[in-house]
């Protein structure tokens, strides 16, 4: 059975947004909160999961991660708002 692949966006304590890739969102968010995630999120805890997208392949997820990381902050905020509102 193939694993699901996810792209996620976190809202950090300093109000910045972090985008990442994982196969287990719950575990990865916990790692970020524990200071064991990406260097970027260390010292910016606690983090809040504000957006996720699921993909069937790692390549599709990684491509989407790159797309989101390339967005302006305003466009990232709209992406998050579309999911929450």
From Swiss-Prot:
Q: Where is this region: Disordered?
A: 58-85
Q: Where is the GIY-YIG domain?
A: 3-78
Q: Which SUPFAM superfamilies match?
A: GIY-YIG endonuclease
Per UniProt, the ranges with Basic and acidic residues bias are: 58-70
A Pfam family found in this protein is GIY-YIG
- Name the InterPro entries on file: GIY-YIG_endonuc, GIY-YIG_endonuc_sf, UPF0213_domain
In the record, the note on similarity to other proteins reads: Belongs to the UPF0213 family.
Entries under PANTHER family matching the protein: UPF0213 PROTEIN YHBQ
Q: What is this protein called?
A: UPF0213 protein NP_0776A
